[in-house]
Structures are given as C-alpha cells and as structure tokens.
C-alpha cells in the first residue's frame, strides 16, 4: 500500500511492523558504505523524515540508488521495521527502489550555511527547507481557519476587484496602471487596489455580513522587515454592528485562527519555537486564553507621557494628543503596560481615514487598532460614517475626488444605517504566529521595492 510519511508516524507503530508499503518522496540525504546505504526521505506531508535502509544483497540497482543526490525524486517499496533503541522509532527496509528524477550536483540547498537573505533570493527553492515548510504549513492553516470562522458565522465571501479608480486610504501610495495604446484602458486613471473595503461596504448593505480575503498592493519604497508591496488582507464588513460589536468579532476571529494552529500544527510550532522563539507556544496560548483590554486613545497618550516622565526612553519622546503613535509606543502599550492584546480606540480624526464615523466630541472617530505583543498593530478597524452630509464634508476637507467616490457616498442615501469593519494584514498575522522577524519570510514569493523575481 502507498502511504504518506505523516500517515506512518501518526499511527500505532506496532501494527505497521512487517507491512509492505510504497513511498514516493525526495531524498534529503544519502550515505552508503558499499554494502549498505541509508536514504533520508521526505514527501512534504510532515517535517519528520523517514529513513530507508538499502542493502547490496537486497536490491539489483544498489549503485544507482547510492548515487541518488539530495532532492532526487524516488519511489521506494519496503517493509516497516521497528527500531525502538534508535533515534527514530522505525525505518523502511528497502525491497525495490527507483530514481524517478535525479537532482543536479549544484543544488543550492546542499550548502548548509545558507542564510535567510540568500533564501529570499532563491524563493523558488526555500520551501524545501524545514523552516519555510513549517512557516507555509502554518500560513495554510491560518488561511483555512479564516474561511472556516467566516463560514461558521454566515459571512459571504466577496471577490473584491484588484483594479480601482479609488484610493480608499487617501495615502496616495498606489500603483498606477500604464496607458494601453496611448489611452486609458478603463477610460480614467486606474490603480491596483489597496483595499476591498469600499466594495465590501456596498455588499454588506445587502448581505449583512461579508468579507474579502485576497491580495492588495501598496507602493511604499520601504526596505524594513515589516512592509511588502503585495500582501494579503482579511477585511470583514458587518451591517448593524457598532465599534464595540466589531471589536468582539475581531477578538473571536483572532482567537479562532490561533487556536486552529495550536491544534493542527503542533509539530511545526515546536520546530519554530526552537528556531525563532522558545516561548512561542506559551505566547499563543496566552492570547487564546486572555481577554483583550480596551483603552481610549487619549488615555494611552497619558500613559505614554507618564512613562516618559518616569524615565522611559522612546526614540520619539514627544507625546501629545493628536500624534500618530509609532510602533515603539504601540508595543509599550501591549508589552509593558498591559502585557497582552489591547484595543486602542477613538483616535483623533486627523490621523485616521476619511470614512470613519465622527464621534460626538467632533475630534475623534469611532476607530480601533488591536495591538499584539511582539508585533504592535495587527488589526485596524472602525465604525463607518453613515451620514451623507458628514462624509461629504470630510471628503471636501481632505480635497478628495468627489466624482470618483460619488457611488460610495450614495450608499448613505439608501438605508445605510450602520456598518463596521476591520482589516488584518495576513502576513503580519503569520509573522506573529510563527515568530519570524521578517515579513518577507511569511509569503511564498515576496514583492517589495526593487524585488520582483519569480
């Protein structure tokens, strides 16, 4: 019978002893001593490798198999033998072996001294390392868990467009589409989308609860370990939900996806804990078990100012109401002051996007950021402005192109009572759950300023 390596190690070994099985896998290493050889095999189903022992008196093509190089594709038939005194609990005694495809001698990963930067430059090969195998397995679980949560809570998935005539964030950091045959293909200047939020609001007013989950683009000339030009966003939008209700949903979603990884990726998390952060699993368990604190922006400013007065040093020690908090301030709030996930809420309107609902104080908007230890901001969200007049006034204050946003304004004219939504940078979530330090290591083929290989 044909088995995956994961299936072999996930069942009772005793029942497998003496059974004849077939494995299709790649060679991780191969050593021989003329009469006996040892293949270390992996088929991608698990971080655990399977050792296969081949002997010159058991197979006809011993020399051919002895020449199998690292990452050669092979098919092996053999008998399971228990090895209770060895490092691995069992091995495969080879009866038949065949090289399906040999690997060239200059295979990059045969060099054990490769650093992460070299692997980023060879992103087509890095999934063959244990590190990126573990990261991408966790990423896959997180993505599935997002869809699972949304499906269980009756959200409809929306395929948001990637071409847009709007800049929803108003930051101007968009990729423009080139003219086609010396004319605007869509009849107007067009960009790659930075968010699917505006379109999600339109559908939330008909479906109630919707979400987008797909790629977005931002033309930031940033070379930090926290920025990508192409990244994935999770963007739910809920009708008849206020800021507090939206925060409850954020908390439930974050806990759900982290719990899914704790349940399904124990092996990967143990490997990542050894590689990146020895407290990784405890950190994730604490998030699942904790209650997310909620703190007013104005109170956070006072807390930070008091910290400076008491001798704490930030790179930016000028703390005042109206400032856009930096990562160092956000991390202080969730790592030092609260020591756990915390929502900051009701930010000044001048540092937030145009579509956020103006509070009664006329100074702040119904907005929130979820701050997570080790990352800072993970989630940003708000209750949306439901007044046509107030939204129009805000657009005019910011000198935004009213004509291209008229459809969005018009939503308020047709029963738009209340709507709230949030965005989660998926790669930042993967960073947090895996403990990696560079966001370029959380996406299969990273796109950033000056990098477009593969």
From Swiss-Prot:
It catalyses: tRNA(Asn) + L-asparagine + ATP = L-asparaginyl-tRNA(Asn) + AMP + diphosphate + H(+). Keywords: Aminoacyl-tRNA synthetase, ATP-binding, Cytoplasm, Ligase, Nucleotide-binding, Protein biosynthesis. It is an enzyme of class 6 (ligase). One of its GO terms (biological process) is asparaginyl-tRNA aminoacylation. Its EC number is 6.1.1.22. SUPFAM superfamilies: Class II aaRS and biotin synthetases, Nucleic acid-binding proteins. It holds the Pfam family tRNA-synt_2. It comes from the Bacteria. It is found in: Cytoplasm. The keyword ATP-binding applies. GO terms for molecular function: asparagine-tRNA ligase activity; ATP binding; nucleic acid binding. One of its GO terms (cellular component) is cytoplasm. PROSITE patterns: AA_TRNA_LIGASE_II (PS50862). InterPro entries: Aa-tRNA-synt_II, aa-tRNA-synth_II, aa-tRNA-synth_II/BPL/LPL, Asn-tRNA-ligase, Asp/Asn-tRNA-synth_IIb, NA-bd_OB-fold, NA-bd_OB_tRNA. Belongs to the class-II aminoacyl-tRNA synthetase family. Homodimer. This is Asparagine--tRNA ligase. It comes from Ureaplasma parvum serovar 3 (strain ATCC 700970).
């Amino acid at each position: 019978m044909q088995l995956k390596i994961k299936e072999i190690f996930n069942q009772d070994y005793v029942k497998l002893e003496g059974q004849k099985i077939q494995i299709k896998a790649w060679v991780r290493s191969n050593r021989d001593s003329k009469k006996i050889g040892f293949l270390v095999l992996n088929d991608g189903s698990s971080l655990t490798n399977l050792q296969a022992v081949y002997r010159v008196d058991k197979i006809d093509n011993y020399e051919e198999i002895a020449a199998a190089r690292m990452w050669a594709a092979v098919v092996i038939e053999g008998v399971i033998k228990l090895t209770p005194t060895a490092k691995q609990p069992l091995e495969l005694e080879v009866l038949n072996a065949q090289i399906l495809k040999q690997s060239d001698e200059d295979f990059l990963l045969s060099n054990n001294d490769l650093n992460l930067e070299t692997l980023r430059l060879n992103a087509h090969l890095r999934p063959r390392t244990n590190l990126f195998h573990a990261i991408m397995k966790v990423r896959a679980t997180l993505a599935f868990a997002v869809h699972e949560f949304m499906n269980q809570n009756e959200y409809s998935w929306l395929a948001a467009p990637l071409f847009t005539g709007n800049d929803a964030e108003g930051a101007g950091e968009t990729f423009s589409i080139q003219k086609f045959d010396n004319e605007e293909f869509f009849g107007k200047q067009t960009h790659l989308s930075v968010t699917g939020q505006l379109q999600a609001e339109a559908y939330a007013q008909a479906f109630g609860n919707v979400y987008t989950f797909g790629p977005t683009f931002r033309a930031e000339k940033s070379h930090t370990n926290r920025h990508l030009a192409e990244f994935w966003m999770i963007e739910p939008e809920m009708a008849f939900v206020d800021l507090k209700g939206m925060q409850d949903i954020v908390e439930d979603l974050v806990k759900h996806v982290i719990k899914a990884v704790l349940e399904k990726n124990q092996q990967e998390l143990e490997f990542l804990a050894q590689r990146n952060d020895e407290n990784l699993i405890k950190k994730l368990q604490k998030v699942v078990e904790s209650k997310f604190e909620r703190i007013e922006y104005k109170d956070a400013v006072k807390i930070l100012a008091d910290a400076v007065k008491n001798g704490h040093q930030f790179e930016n020690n000028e703390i005042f109401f109206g400032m856009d908090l930096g990562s160092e301030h956000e991390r202080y709030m969730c790592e030092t002051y609260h020591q756990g996930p915390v929502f900051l809420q009701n930010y000044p309107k001048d540092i937030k996007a145009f579509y956020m609902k103006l509070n009664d104080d006329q100074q702040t908007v119904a907005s929130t950021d979820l701050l997570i230890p080790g990352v800072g901001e993970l989630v940003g969200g708000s209750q949306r402005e439901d007044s046509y007049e107030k939204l129009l006034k805000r657009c005019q204050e910011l000198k935004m192109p009213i004509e291209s946003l008229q459809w969005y304004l018009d939503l308020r004219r047709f029963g738009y009572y209340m709507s709230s939504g949030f965005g989660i940078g998926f790669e930042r979530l993967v960073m947090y759950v895996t403990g990696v330090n560079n966001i370029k290591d959380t996406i299969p083929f990273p796109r950033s300023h000056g990098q477009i290989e593969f």
